[in-house]
Structure formats: structure tokens, C-alpha cells
Amino acid sequence: MNFQPLGKRVLVKRVEEANTTASGIIIPDNAQEKPSRGEVVAVSSEVKEMLCGDKVLFGKFSGSEVTLDGEKFLIIDSEDIFGIIK
């Protein structure tokens, strides 16, 4: 994929979370919350705090969902990312 975010934005691929509870109950797709974790796929030249491959935590309603090469991603302002998961 060839995509370069502009401004202070990053392109993030959501990390899918388990769809079962600890006790084994399966949660249907329409009842699941959208994941608020992801992996940075592309970074604007203005963003210095993050690198491609970083695992990040962001708000549930952050960013704009886009489809590139048949995959869903989020374009998020770097200020809407809470932190990097180490």
C-alpha cells in the first residue's frame, strides 16, 4: 500500500479483539465494541512521536474509517492517540 498521511495524522489498522468472554460466551458482532487499539501503518512527516509498527491506544470514536486496497483503516490525528503500548 502506498499512502502518506498529511498534517499531524497517522494511519492505523485496528487490532481485532477476542469475540468471546473469559467464561466462553460468544459475543455477536452487533454487540461488540469497536477496538480502541491498533498498529500504526503510516505516519505523516510532521509526527515525530510514533513510528510504523507501534501499537497504540486511541478513543472509541477517534479518526475516520477508510478502505485502502480492500482493508479498513483509521486516519487519526496524532493528538487523539492516548499512548504507545510497549
From Swiss-Prot:
One of its GO terms (cellular component) is cytoplasm. It is found in: Cytoplasm. The keyword Cytoplasm applies. CDD domains: cpn10. GO terms for biological process: chaperone cofactor-dependent protein refolding. Pfam families: Cpn10. SUPFAM superfamilies: GroES-like (SSF50129). Signal peptide: none annotated. GO terms for molecular function: ATP binding; metal ion binding; protein folding chaperone; protein-folding chaperone binding; unfolded protein binding. Keywords: Chaperone, Cytoplasm. Heptamer of 7 subunits arranged in a ring. Interacts with the chaperonin GroEL. Belongs to the GroES chaperonin family. Together with the chaperonin GroEL, plays an essential role in assisting protein folding. The GroEL-GroES system forms a nano-cage that allows encapsulation of the non-native substrate proteins and provides a physical environment optimized to promote and accelerate protein folding. GroES binds to the apical surface of the GroEL ring, thereby capping the opening of the GroEL channel. NCBIfam families: PRK00364.3-3. This is Co-chaperonin GroES. The lineage of its organism: Bacteria, Pseudomonadati, Campylobacterota, Epsilonproteobacteria, Campylobacterales.
